[in-house]
């Protein structure tokens, strides 16, 4: 109805091949593939640099450990006040 059928795509492909020729299309495909490969390589080289960046030199602690440390001084304060 409003979509492009397989036959219409096939006719468009034949027209493109007739206009540009197979050598030119092969060259364009190779150039496009090389560009995509180069882009992927650049992105993969950039990933390890992001993973190595740290904000500080200390080990992350769990929430439970932090709560235990904070709770210990509070209990001492409560005992001293009583």
UniProtKB/Swiss-Prot annotation:
Keywords: Cell inner membrane, Cell membrane, Membrane, Protein transport, Translocation, Transmembrane, Transmembrane helix, Transport
Chain segments carrying region Disordered: 41-82
Membrane topology annotation: Single-pass membrane protein
Cross-referenced Pfam families: TatA_B_E (PF02416)
Chief place where the protein resides: membrane
Localization, UniProt: Cell inner membrane
KW Transcription regulation (keyword) present: no
UniProt keyword 4Fe-4S present: no
GO CC annotation, single: TAT protein transport complex
Transmembrane segments: 1-21
Gene Ontology terms describing biological process: protein transport by the Tat complex
InterPro entries hit by this protein: TatA/B/E (IPR003369), TatA/E (IPR006312)
Any one GO molecular function term: protein transmembrane transporter activity
Task performed by this protein: Part of the twin-arginine translocation (Tat) system that transports large folded proteins containing a characteristic twin-arginine motif in their signal peptide across membranes. TatA could form the protein-conducting channel of the Tat system.
HAMAP family named in the record: TatA_E
Assembly and interaction partners: The Tat system comprises two distinct complexes: a TatABC complex, containing multiple copies of TatA, TatB and TatC subunits, and a separate TatA complex, containing only TatA subunits. Substrates initially bind to the TatABC complex, which probably triggers association of the separate TatA complex to form the active translocon.
Family affiliation: Belongs to the TatA/E family.
Protein's name in the database: Sec-independent protein translocase protein TatA
Organism: Vibrio campbellii (strain ATCC BAA-1116)
Lineage: Bacteria, Pseudomonadati, Pseudomonadota, Gammaproteobacteria, Vibrionales
Record gene name: tatA
